[in-house]
Amino acid sequence: VAFSLRSLIPLVFFGAMHCGSSGANAGPSLDGGATDSAHAQPPSEGGAEASASSDAGASTETGARDGPMADSEGGAAGAATIDTFVGVNALITDSVANLAPIGVVREYHNWGWLGNNFNDLPYPQTLYTPDIPSFGWDWDSFFSGLQAMGVSGFPAVQGAAPWVNNSAVPPADGSPTAAASYIAHGDTMFQIAARWGKTKVADSVLKLESDQARKSGLGTVEYFEDYNEEDNAAGFTGDVFAAMASADYDGDEGRLGATIGVKTADPNAKLVMGGLSGRYGSGDTWVSSITTFLDAARTWSAAHRTDATFATDVVNVHYYSFGPGAPAPALSPEADGVEAKLAAVVSYRDQHMPGKPVWWTEFGYDTFGGSPLHAPALGSNSAFVVQGQWLIRELLAALAAGVERATVFELDDTCAPPASACNTQFATAGLLGMSGSPKPAWYYLATFRARLSSYTYVGTVPATEANVRVAQFADTKGSGGAFVVWMGTSNASVTPGYALSLPARTSTAKAVALTGGLATGIETTLTPSAGVVTLDVSETPTIVLYSP
């Protein structure tokens, strides 16, 4: 779905920047304006609600209850540590310093940006620092900058280049279900994997504009996504997409030549299928739309590939918790059953595509009340605070379902309220406002990742109070662990003095409250009594860290 952006940027957008999952769409911002330091404390978007006083923090009261037993309730645990699990959608113009604290970066990357030669079909020369127009974009520096800050980034190549007539499907003289129809797309995927992947290729196979540095094997990108919501506006069916994926993956098992596909360029590279939207409004359920698409992709692959395998390394989905319709607000992850929906996709993967991780690469909430995807104000908590609460709870639902990566949409707002454009879904879903000022959600996500960076999800723990949710984590770098505790309600509920049992031989514990204005939260020492600590539990998740 194409859309216009502010300033003069639309002139170079040849394909959709972001295809929303329902109705009208607003895409990623290109205005920058983010702060320069990951731990800078600029004025927070949302005013007073961004402060610590807006959230019910952890208390240091003591009490007693039976000890926890982490179980498998809520789905299979993913193996990813939190530093590689959580991430954000962004653009090259976004500040690396603002991206890095959130984690993995999914970079929207229009196919048309990669070449401007309209007369050299089907293989235009590739650009990595485009000169038309002269915005000075440099993807080499972008991905290396993320890597230097300990964060991985990957491009989501989307839309179509102008030299293929702005069509996502093959030209009229090509068969939509023939991998050979996508040789130009597979060639592009080869070129970017050759440059940013880990394997150097022969200089003679590089297709570059004359002003581009001749480089390969830079080792800054491992994953390469080959579309965005192909089942939405682009109109791909599963079999059609499987044909393109076969070209993008390994040049249709090498049949398309020695310079087609990411695996041909770098055997270590991973191809991520474009994130599926689930065709909102089609009459199908989201889960059945996803599985029907994957069924068709698998059927095509069984008939056309000798390995009989759908050519992707990752199962990739998008889901947003829309409410029943404007002006109703969006739904919390618990009210919308997000965990069960994602778990159904994971179960399908387990049965039909074992070994391929499931990623959830778009989810989010707007903060402007005119949007059909807006987080509501609840009690004393503003929409800005509730956005942050629900995003963390979305991450917890994904972990419980067995999802291995989750990237929130998106870093920046694309409009400033009360402009009418803000009534469009996704326009105010950013973690930063248009001024570059972080919302509470940015701080919540940064704290979640910073505090649990080396931790893996273990499972849920049965709670002793109604509506209290408890998730348990283990530290891969030590013998300690963590709980995350929250109310799974959407009415500003608080359970005071909740008794949380700690594992045997725990000697120290501390609570970390997610708070606007602080990228690592507010830490409070807890004193265990008979192996138990107490804390007030609110709808803002609280992290409890413990160690022997």
Residue ranges and their predicted role:
Residues 11-80:
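Ser/Thr-rich, Pro/Gly/Ala-heavy low-complexity intrinsically disordered linkers and tails
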Residues 1-9:
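Bacterial N-terminal signal peptides that target proteins for export
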Residues 463-509, 514, 541:
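Carbohydrate-binding surface patches
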